[in-house]
């Protein structure tokens, strides 16, 4: 089936390779009835494979919807899934949107008394199943919803579904990166060239805080070692240690230094233990 997009918006070979490398086409064993049009086939092990062509078509459609919002701050990006926290924050920093990374506070769209109250014109969620609270509240106040949907995702109250794998860090980060780049292109902020945007896709990938801390410690230790010129070799003085001066524990003991423990004890200077100790004058 030929793409319905104009040639200028069609996916390039490099973009298709990125989607395949990030495993955006890998679905789940379960498949929602409304997600069947986006499924290409089902593997022998039961995993559904998504159609990458339709993924790109819906991604461009979502970008055109986002670019139609005059004020970028009226777009709210949401991710309760940890793998999407860094992606939505980077997307918001590059496009000017609002970001909610982590738990969505109930009432953020409906209860104007709360401190986290927002009135966006459009919301984008990472997973309809995890971000169900935000989608439900958006339906109460007529806010359109764009969602990254896997094969098992419910499409209730979702207006634009981007079929993709929303379970792994690389697929989530890549889709958010492609979406941000396409939005900036449609707004005219960056040119439509391969090197028009200098933000790497790695910046959108989730990173484990423990791995980041360990990497920072290793870099700091390496920098300190380079500054101080620490030598990894052992000091030369240790190799010249005179072994002959050490005690020879295997040699015979020196004469006169042993004691015969089986011999009778020597008599005390004042006599035996039973001798009079001269206590007569105590009283």
From Swiss-Prot:
It holds the Pfam family Ribosomal_S2. Gene3D superfamilies: Glucose-6-phosphate isomerase like protein, domain 1. It comes from Laccaria bicolor (strain S238N-H82 / ATCC MYA-4686) (Bicoloured deceiver). Component of the small ribosomal subunit. Mature ribosomes consist of a small (40S) and a large (60S) subunit. The 40S subunit contains about 33 different proteins and 1 molecule of RNA (18S). The 60S subunit contains about 49 different proteins and 3 molecules of RNA (25S, 5.8S and 5S). Interacts with RPS21. Belongs to the universal ribosomal protein uS2 family. One of its GO terms (molecular function) is structural constituent of ribosome. The keyword Protein biosynthesis does not apply. It is found in: Cytoplasm. Residues 247-283 are annotated as: Disordered. This is Small ribosomal subunit protein uS2. Keywords: Cytoplasm, Ribonucleoprotein, Ribosomal protein.
């Amino acid at each position: 089936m030929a793409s319905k997009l104009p040639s200028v918006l069609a996916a390039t070979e490099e973009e298709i390779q990125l989607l395949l490398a990030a495993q955006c086409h890998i679905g789940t064993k379960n498949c929602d009835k409304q997600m069947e049009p986006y499924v290409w086939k089902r593997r022998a092990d039961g995993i559904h494979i998504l159609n990458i062509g339709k993924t790109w078509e819906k991604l461009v459609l979502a970008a055109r919807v986002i670019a139609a919002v005059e004020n970028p701050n009226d777009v709210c990006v949401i991710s309760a899934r940890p793998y999407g926290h860094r992606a939505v924050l980077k997307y918001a920093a590059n496009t000017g949107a609002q970001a909610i990374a982590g738990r969505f506070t109930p009432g953020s769209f409906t209860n104007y008394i709360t401190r986290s109250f927002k009135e966006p014109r459009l919301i984008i969620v990472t997973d309809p199943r995890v971000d169900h609270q935000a989608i439900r509240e958006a339906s109460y106040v007529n806010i359109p919803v764009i969602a990254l949907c896997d094969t098992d995702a419910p499409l209730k109250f979702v207006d634009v579904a981007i079929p993709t794998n929303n379970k792994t860090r690389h697929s989530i980060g890549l889709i958010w990166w492609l979406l941000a780049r396409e939005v900036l292109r449609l707004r005219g902020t960056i040119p439509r060239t391969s090197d028009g945007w200098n933000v790497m896709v790695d910046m959108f990938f989730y990173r484990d805080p423990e791995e980041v801390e360990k990497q920072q410690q290793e870099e700091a230790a390496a920098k300190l070692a380079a500054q101080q010129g620490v030598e990894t070799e052992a000091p030369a003085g240790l190799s010249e240690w005179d072994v002959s001066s050490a005690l020879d524990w295997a040699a015979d003991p020196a004469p006169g230094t042993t004691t015969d423990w089986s011999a009778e004890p020597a008599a005390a200077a004042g006599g035996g233990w039973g001798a009079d100790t001269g206590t007569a004058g105590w009283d």
